[in-house]
Amino acid sequence: MPRPVLSVTAFCHRLGKRESKRSFMGNSSNSWSHASFPKLELGLGQRPSPPRESPTCSICLERLREPISLDCGHDFCIRCFSTHRIPGCELPCCPECRKICKQKKGLRSLGERMKLLPQRPLPPALQETCAVRAERLLLVRINASGGLILRMGAINRCLKHPLARDTPVCLLAVLGEQHSGKSFLLDHLLRGLPGLESGDSTRPRAEGSLPGIRWGANGLTRGIWMWSHPFLLGKEGKKVAVFLVDTGDVMSPELSRETRVKLCALTMMLSSYQILNTSQELKDTDLGYLEMFVHVAEVMGKHYGMVPIQHLDLLVRDSSHHNKSGQGHVGDILQKLSGKYPKVQELLLGKRARCYLLPAPERQWVNKGQASPGGNTEDDFSHHFRAYISDVLSTAPQHAKSRCQGYWSEGRAMARGDRRLLTGQQLAQEIKNLSGWMGKSGPSFSSPDEMAAQLHDLRKVEAAKKEFEEYVRQQDIATKRIFSALRVLPDTMRNLLSTQKDAILARHGVALLCKEREQTLEALEAELQAEAKAFMDSYTMRFCGHLAAVGGAVGAGLMGLAGGVVGAGMAAAALAAEAGMVAAGAAVGATGAAVVGGGVGAGLAATVGCMEKEEDERVQGGDREPLLQEE
């Protein structure tokens, strides 16, 4: 096939372009090929920089005009390609590589070019993060009868998120009655977290600036809710995963007292920074709930080794005392209490709680930011409210969920960084342990003191089980060897276990506090008895096996000794017949002894010796037969 002829102008133009590129970029083995596309980096980091050069035509080396692309990968202007196309050729021939290929109008799509690039898979953490959509999840549901249903799947989805699984967590929980503005507060906290996480701004963004990120307000607030996506805040190397938690209607008077106590316990486990949101004034119901919550938190903290109240904000909205400082308002509250709520007084006198007073908002500001008659929408409420949101979000990383000091002597697992800080995975395990206790069909409780008594008894029961398990393990180790096991008969071992069981029940039973002490002891005794029976079954089989092995070895030795003595006597009697025959019998007997044991060998030697003696007597008597017989 003849080569197409390039015009002099096109050839000089092309040569000049290539020579200028050589002088600027240096020699290249592929300098005559068309300019390649810029490399695309796949990832989730910064956006790729724009290409330095636009795609050029392989003929005129100019920017492509009305481009076409061939299957071989070369791109041309439609005018240049038509000029240099070989006439009479049905399929177009590429002027660059001389291959016959199909013609496509326009450049190859970006997807086709990306398929040619080496694909780098994303890290597993980023893959899981991108695959999960952030939303509000129900963690604790209250059914129609008032019972609680803990959804461990939702809890694991939140706390075992790739960004929170091995990271200290801060759970920012908003408490308060229904229709007290909790959803409004949560919505602004949620819209302020992404900007603070990215470092763009520490102020909450305007309404509608973050589509899809909104807490929302509806009537389905029964239970405890959590935003599924954590936000990483704090300095580099000390990041904390911050979650938002809505306690729903845990303060509802319609719930039973036992349900409210359990909800307080779960709220304590699912929060490290609490905000008690109330309107106008702190009412007696608010203080009563706060007293119960602090009491339950202390009980749970003592049992699980966690700090009961790490930080608590009293947020009073629509306050008529907005000109007074929060500390001054706390002083007024303490004067009114007069010893009625001792735990609340102790909390307010310390440094773990603070009070914020917010004035009533203007109606125009509440109605989606419409301007006030004076034209000033930044009223006192919005100014103080935005300042409070910024303060909460900036200090949240300082209040990650943590354990009490000195609790690590019990051998708990160590967290990353500060070993007192709980990671998301560790907190999920603690909540699972709590749900296991709450799910047991035990006596009910209607006060924090009764709950404390049950947790105390639970701790004693677990200690008794561990003590008995350790005793059984020591007995198992001590009787592993044959002769150690044979010293302790099964009946003796059964008596040892029974004595130890009775001693443990007597020692730990005295320390039980609940009224149902007898039922608890009966259940504990049944569990210990079942464990003892399981060990005795395996121990009896082991003892019988050891005894059979030792008996077989001793029996074989005794039988071999007796057979040897008898065989020696018979061989001595056979010596009177013929020394050669006896020697042969002894040799056969020795071989038999080597194969089947001393007893069988000795017996075989004696038998052969007797047979040879009888044959010798028969020959001497004249009863001789020919070696060969004829018919």
Swiss-Prot record:
The keyword Nucleotide-binding applies. Auto-ubiquitinated. Residues 166-397 form the GB1/RHD3-type G domain. GTP binds at residues 317-318. Residues 131-631 are annotated as: Interaction with ZBTB16. InterPro entries: G_GB1_RHD3_dom, Guanylate-bd_N, P-loop_NTPase, Znf_C3HC4_RING-type, Znf_RING, Znf_RING/FYVE/PHD. It catalyses: S-ubiquitinyl-[E2 ubiquitin-conjugating enzyme]-L-cysteine + [acceptor protein]-L-lysine = [E2 ubiquitin-conjugating enzyme]-L-cysteine + N(6)-ubiquitinyl-[acceptor protein]-L-lysine. It is a multi-pass membrane protein; Peripheral membrane protein. Signal peptide: none annotated. Pathway: Protein modification; protein ubiquitination. Gene3D superfamilies: P-loop containing nucleotide triphosphate hydrolases, Zinc/RING finger domain, C3HC4 (zinc finger). It is an enzyme of class 2 (transferase). Keywords: Cell projection, Cytoplasm, Cytoplasmic vesicle, Endosome, GTP-binding, Membrane, Metal-binding, Neurogenesis, Nucleotide-binding, Nucleus, Synapse, Transferase, Transmembrane, Transmembrane helix, Ubl conjugation, Ubl conjugation pathway, Zinc, Zinc-finger. It is found in: Membrane; Cytoplasm; Nucleus; Nucleus, Nuclear body. Its main location: membrane. The chain crosses the membrane at residues 547-567, 580-600. Predominantly expressed in brain. A zinc finger (RING-type) spans 57-98. GO terms for molecular function: GTP binding; GTPase activity; ubiquitin protein ligase activity; zinc ion binding. Belongs to the TRAFAC class dynamin-like GTPase superfamily. GB1/RHD3 GTPase family. GB1 subfamily. PANTHER family: GUANYLATE BINDING PROTEIN. E3 ubiquitin-protein ligase that plays an important role in neuronal differentiation, including neurogenesis and gliogenesis, during brain development. During embryonic development initiates neuronal differentiation by inducing cell cycle arrest at the G0/G1 phase through up-regulation of cell-cycle regulatory proteins. Plays a role not only in the fetal period during the development of the nervous system, but also in the adult brain, where it is involved in the maintenance of neural functions and protection of the nervous tissue cells from oxidative stress-induced damage. This is RING finger protein 112. It comes from Rattus norvegicus.
